[in-house]
Amino acid sequence: MKKQHTPLRRRFLKKMALITAGCFALKNGEVNAVTENKKSAHSSDFAIFIKDLLSKKTNYIGEVICVTNYNVNKDILESNISLFRSLPPKAITPDDIIYIEGANCIWGRVFDSFLNVEWFGAIGDGVTDDTKSIEKANNYAHKYELPLHFPTGKKYIVNGSFELDVAKTSWHGGDNSILHWSQSPSQFALRVFSSRSTYSHTHVNNKLALSNLTFLGGGIRNLYDAIAISLGGNEESSSLFSLKNINVQGWDINLFFNDNSWRIKIEDSLFLWGRILSKPNAKNSGECMYFSNCMFADNFSTTELYTGDWHYNACSIDNHEVKVFGDACVYFDNGHIENPGRKNNKFVAVGIYSKDASASVTNSRLIMSKTPKLITTPVFYVADENQSLGLYVNNLRCDQNTNFDPSATDAKGIFLVGGNGKVVMDNIFINIVNSSFIA
């Protein structure tokens, strides 16, 4: 009995597989075959534009074709090549992006790991407003639960605010992929969070949420009065994800850690001119936050942390102060601390401003570079009321210069630390220019 129904069953399964084929990746063999065909194919083998699919007939259901812009004069294929596979007519409703109705079939876009913003009309020429195209692309990325890709070397002009649910999608660029806001959004440029509230399913958050993207706002003298990237919110499990190779500049607040943001890693990233801020009295926030190989610099910018434990490894802070409030604790290790090179006389690198906050600076280097003005502030500060936790400094090399002399003010000769809070210092290596600077 089973043998008699086997051919029928196979035909049924084959038909079902064809209907759903557009939602899945090509097999490796098919991808390789298509790649080889692209190398040797003449322009007649390709649909020149997406619109050509409307009149194109398939030779058989399951046929894979390439759609590209073919430059006859240069006799080359442009890089933006897409693959489409033919599906049975009426197998799925066309949407003119992923599924396009052809002459005798539905042409379904073949994608194995991401969606491309250019499929949705984004240009990336640094002039055209791509907001609507990227909004549509982001909606589809959430719908299909696939990453969204911004091609290399493109600058997308946008405005308004976007949201990224890491339980469903992520954003990734290539070399020098830029998102430039033409005007300040009302609250934030991008909010990153997770809608996955079931604790046993938070493993879906354990991913790279953002990578290889630059978020541009205003200039150094006209920062946008908004948040560039907001992390967390009312959702309970906005955690466990990472940001890598992110560049943020031109915003009053470059990063904002909201409620329910914890165990987030940020690496190989650059933050210029604006603040890094954690929400005061945040709930369920601040557990094991980690910066690795990041740079925070310029414009007297600050990081202001109010709760949680914050780890900095191999980071640089140049003309930037890490301010510790509430019960927050900071661990700065294997880093680089450097004063500003501008005409000013103030430089504090790490300051502790409450009785329950703490910080440690270990295995790091402090460089007091020459500036036109005499720097008169201590590099570290501990509030008077902090008598039990305070600041711990160990294995710090300090390259002192003649333009640094806190004794010229009411610091009264204190070399490294201001305030009367608790300080423990071990293994300080100082390249002394003038020994009178040491208290």
Can you name each region flagged by the protein language model?
Residues 2-20:
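N-terminal secretory signal peptides and thylakoid transit peptides that target proteins
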Residues 40-60, 119-150:
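Acidic Gly/Asp/Thr-rich repetitive segments characteristic of extracellular carbohydrate-active
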Residues 45-51, 67-82, 142-170, 174-186, ...:
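N-terminal extracellular ligand-recognition/capping segment immediately after the signal peptide
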Residues 64-114:
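Short, surface-exposed terminal/edge motifs of secreted or surface/virion proteins that either
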Residues 110-133, 169-225:
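Right-handed parallel beta-helix/beta-spiral solenoid domain characteristic of secreted/periplasmic
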Residues 146, 159-161, 175, 181-187, ...:
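Short glycine/acidic-rich loop motifs that flank beta-strands on beta-rich extracellular proteins
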Residues 170-174, 205-210, 240-244, 263-267, ...:
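All-beta strand scaffolds that present successive hydrophobic residues in beta-strands
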Residues 203-205, 211-295:
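Right-handed parallel beta-helix
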